[in-house]
Amino acid sequence: MDFKILKEKLPQSNLTVVLTGAGISKESGIPTFRGEDGLWKKYNPEELATPWAFQRNPALVWEWYDYRRRIISKAKPNKCHLLIAEFEERFKNVRVITQNVDGLHEAAGSTNVIELHGNIWKVKCTKCDFRGINREVPLSKIPPECPKCGSIVRPDVVWFGEPLPSDKLTEAMELSQRADLFIVIGTSLMVQPAASLPFLALERGAFVVEVSPEETPLSRKAHLFFQMGAVEFAMKFEEKEG
């Protein structure tokens, strides 16, 4: 029944927002970098993904990102990434907000994506205004250098202790407040400010749907809660087509 309700809501919605987190990418073989999953050479991500770690030892931080980029380069969008891209084709005004930095939504064909935490394939210079794409795997030089001024570049991602880019956050909040339908997939809703977005949507009267194998602070408040993984959700959604 719940799938039937969701299928009725999708074509009726004037603005559908899909918020995704690490859970969707985990099913493409990308570790969540939390808990045991996240350990690399006995370091926790919280020790490496910070401006202070980068200041102290940029080569170590880049070694970890090189390792992550190798994993991500082998990953393919899964059925749920593809389903979300299909929503954009089939229904009006579908926007994706993601906490993931892997670029798998774009690889699946989604075009309206806000990457709240940045993108692992993008770099920015620590000295000048250079920003660009670096898809080299593995990196030939660690740390990589700016093609413009020769200084070290860093991953263009949001690290622990850094604010989200204000333009992206503002846009994400505005979309959440305007959404008729808000779908949350694969996020534990523990990291602010992204965790507040579905609650903003709820307050403004959106129909809120959650897909998660575990209960989250949203689960009992959502109009529909699919307690399952992202790929299982996509397969069941497609099974019940027609």
From Swiss-Prot:
<dbReference type="InterPro" id="IPR026591">
    <property type="entry name" value="Sirtuin_cat_small_dom_sf"/>
</dbReference>
<dbReference type="InterPro" id="IPR050134">
    <property type="entry name" value="NAD-dep_sirtuin_deacylases"/>
</dbReference>
<dbReference type="GO" id="GO:0070403">
    <property type="term" value="F:NAD+ binding"/>
</dbReference>
<dbReference type="Pfam" id="PF02146">
    <property type="entry name" value="SIR2"/>
</dbReference>
<dbReference type="InterPro" id="IPR026590">
    <property type="entry name" value="Ssirtuin_cat_dom"/>
</dbReference>
<dbReference type="GO" id="GO:0005737">
    <property type="term" value="C:cytoplasm"/>
</dbReference>
<feature type="binding site">
    <location>
        <position position="125"/>
    </location>
    <ligand>
        <name>Zn(2+)</name>
    </ligand>
</feature>
<dbReference type="GO" id="GO:0008270">
    <property type="term" value="F:zinc ion binding"/>
</dbReference>
<feature type="binding site">
    <location>
        <position position="128"/>
    </location>
    <ligand>
        <name>Zn(2+)</name>
    </ligand>
</feature>
<feature type="active site" description="Proton acceptor">
    <location>
        <position position="117"/>
    </location>
</feature>
<keyword id="KW-0479">Metal-binding</keyword>
<comment type="function">
    <text>NAD-dependent lysine deacetylase and desuccinylase that specifically removes acetyl and succinyl groups on target proteins. Modulates the activities of several proteins which are inactive in their acylated form.</text>
</comment>
<keyword id="KW-0520">NAD</keyword>
<feature type="binding site">
    <location>
        <position position="149"/>
    </location>
    <ligand>
        <name>Zn(2+)</name>
    </ligand>
</feature>
<dbReference type="InterPro" id="IPR029035">
    <property type="entry name" value="DHS-like_NAD/FAD-binding_dom"/>
</dbReference>
<keyword id="KW-0963">Cytoplasm</keyword>
<feature type="binding site">
    <location>
        <begin position="186"/>
        <end position="188"/>
    </location>
    <ligand>
        <name>NAD(+)</name>
    </ligand>
</feature>
<keyword id="KW-0808">Transferase</keyword>
<protein>
    <recommendedName>
        <fullName>NAD-dependent protein deacylase 1</fullName>
        <ecNumber>2.3.1.286</ecNumber>
    </recommendedName>
</protein>
<dbReference type="GO" id="GO:0036055">
    <property type="term" value="F:protein-succinyllysine desuccinylase activity"/>
</dbReference>
<dbReference type="InterPro" id="IPR027546">
    <property type="entry name" value="Sirtuin_class_III"/>
</dbReference>
<dbReference type="GO" id="GO:0017136">
    <property type="term" value="F:histone deacetylase activity, NAD-dependent"/>
</dbReference>
<dbReference type="GO" id="GO:0036054">
    <property type="term" value="F:protein-malonyllysine demalonylase activity"/>
</dbReference>
<dbReference type="InterPro" id="IPR003000">
    <property type="entry name" value="Sirtuin"/>
</dbReference>
<feature type="binding site">
    <location>
        <position position="146"/>
    </location>
    <ligand>
        <name>Zn(2+)</name>
    </ligand>
</feature>
<keyword id="KW-0862">Zinc</keyword>
<comment type="similarity">
    <text>Belongs to the sirtuin family. Class III subfamily.</text>
</comment>
<feature type="domain" description="Deacetylase sirtuin-type">
    <location>
        <begin position="1"/>
        <end position="242"/>
    </location>
</feature>
<feature type="binding site">
    <location>
        <position position="68"/>
    </location>
    <ligand>
        <name>substrate</name>
    </ligand>
</feature>
<feature type="binding site">
    <location>
        <begin position="99"/>
        <end position="102"/>
    </location>
    <ligand>
        <name>NAD(+)</name>
    </ligand>
</feature>
<feature type="binding site">
    <location>
        <begin position="21"/>
        <end position="40"/>
    </location>
    <ligand>
        <name>NAD(+)</name>
    </ligand>
</feature>
<feature type="binding site">
    <location>
        <position position="241"/>
    </location>
    <ligand>
        <name>NAD(+)</name>
    </ligand>
</feature>
<feature type="binding site">
    <location>
        <position position="65"/>
    </location>
    <ligand>
        <name>substrate</name>
    </ligand>
</feature>
